[in-house]
């Protein structure tokens, strides 16, 4: 889900638990949406892109988030909610060699801190790769257009062969 407009930070800030203002370029922050009774509805990570916030939900939660955000944009707010789920594909790359594999695909990951992202290309396809907090090793989420998803997956898989990359369903682990 993307949130555009001058009020994007304030809207997310007032509707969730974390401070969502004054974010650096490509910085990501986790936040939680709760009910009036303090029950957790969803945990998301919002990344500050050039002209919008890219909000990554838990699997299957994007329709709820889109509707929730749209219901809470008030008169005077400068905001527009766009659900890009149908046009994008998300995959993961995890493990000790994840950084090396992405670098071999042409993604300059050195210097990308945890909870930050980078725009790049893999096999001439535009991607946005976000470094998640390390669980046991390097952990990346890679978003690309659906039409480029197979090409990106194949390029990552090919680069990973020398490093023991093993695909695991919709996610790629090594």
Could you tell me what each predicted segment is?
Residues 1-174:
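Basic, glycine/lysine-rich polyanion-binding surfaces/domains
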């Amino acid at each position: 889900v993307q949130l555009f407009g001058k009020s994007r930070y304030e809207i997310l800030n007032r509707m969730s638990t974390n401070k969502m203002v004054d974010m650096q370029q490509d910085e990501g922050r986790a936040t939680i949406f709760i009910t009036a009774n303090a029950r957790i509805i969803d945990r998301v990570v919002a990344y500050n892109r050039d002209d919008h916030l890219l909000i990554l939900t838990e699997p299957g939660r994007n329709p709820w988030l889109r509707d929730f955000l749209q219901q809470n944009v008030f008169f005077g707010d400068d905001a527009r909610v766009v659900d890009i789920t149908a046009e994008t594909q998300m995959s993961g790359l995890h493990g000790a060699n994840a950084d090396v594999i992405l670098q071999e695909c042409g993604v300059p990951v050195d210097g990308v801190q945890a909870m930050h992202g980078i725009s790049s290309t893999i096999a001439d396809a535009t991607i946005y790769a976000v470094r998640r907090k390390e669980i046991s090793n390097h952990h990346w989420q890679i978003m690309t257009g659906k039409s480029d998803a197979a090409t990106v997956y194949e390029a990552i898989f090919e680069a990973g062969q020398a490093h023991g990359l093993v695909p695991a369903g919709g996610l790629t682990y090594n």
